[in-house]
Amino acid sequence: MKKKIAILGSTSSIGKSLLNIIKKDKKNFKIELLTANTNYKDLINQAKQFNVKNLVITDLKSFIKSKNFYKGKKIKIFKNFDSLKIILPKKVDYVMSAI
């Protein structure tokens, strides 16, 4: 069974390193959530690459841009860390912090 993972700060250098490790072992891991502060373009590209359905963007301007940029797709984009209370307890085995 795949381990479900959330990566906080996935667009940082540490976050990108974590994604590279997971990419090499996709059969054992499924990413359920990615977060970023302002870098919504990288975040959305990561979501496409790893088939992630839940994203959190903490910067309001970036959140609005991301919603317009990715309108109509099957990805849920949340605007702050409060949404983690809803997503994390139900969906993930591990939370990796790269903030």
What is the predicted function of each stretch?
Residues 67-99:
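A structured beta-alpha segment of the ubiquitous adenosine-cofactor-binding alpha/beta core
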Residues 1-53:
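N-terminal Rossmann-like dinucleotide-binding module
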Residues 12, 60-61, 82:
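Short, ordered loop/turn segments at secondary-structure junctions
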Residues 17-20, 45-46, 65, 86, ...:
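Alpha-helical scaffold segments in soluble metabolic enzymes
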Residues 42-78:
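Conserved N-terminal catalytic core of the sugar/cofactor nucleotidyltransferase
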Residues 8, 34, 58, 78, ...:
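Structural motif
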Residues 38, 62, 84:
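Residue-level detector of flexible, active-site-proximal loop/helix-junction positions
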